Amino acid sequence: MLRALPAASLTALGGCGMLTSSAPRFEYFIIEDVRGAPVTAPVARLDRTLLLTGGTTQALYDSDRIVFTRDGAGRAYYQFSNWSERPARRILALAETRLSDSGRFRAVAQTVAGVRGDLVLSLRLDELIHDDATTPGTVRVAVTCDLIDWRSRKLLARRSFEQSAPTPTRDSRGAARAASVAVGALLDELTAWVVTSATGAA
């Protein structure tokens, strides 16, 4: 589900302070977790606490602004459309919920919670872009993850993930819908990998 949070946009007309119907409306979009089919088979829980932390995101994507490209080479921001929060932070929160809901760990939290953990998942956002160079356009999302044994400081596994989804419309609203689908598919893949890697290291 896509949610847009419109912000009031006030335009003074001739100094009288009247609102006009042609005034641009600023919108904020929320990246949702569009989940795949739920796993119904019983699963064994690992007696380990998993902590999540964000990696360093490059400056272009370390923003609440929505990035797009028209030619596949240049990059720009939408003028009147933003994410409700920075995508790196939002995706990390969605990954936390996903992994907690998997029921495979004793507990799942972010490192900022101050919880003592056994494993740490570092998640870095590499790309989140609306590519409108072809029709239909697509949204690509890519992340790199490191799974670390926090007690021994040993790198257990590293993997990059990338997913894309077509945009239903050639605008920021369509980009937001596609981003939610792509992020959901990426979290499907990421969750399975984390569980498998953590189980193998147990």
Name each region found by the language model.
Residues 88, 92, 96, 180-183, ...:
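Extracytoplasmic/secreted envelope proteins and their assembly/folding machinery
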Residues 96, 100-104, 191-195, 199:
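Sec-exported extracytoplasmic/periplasmic mature domains
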Residues 20-30, 34-39, 102-152:
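Surface-exposed short loop/turn segments
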Residues 73-82, 151-189:
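Short secondary-structure boundary motifs at beta->alpha junctions and helix caps
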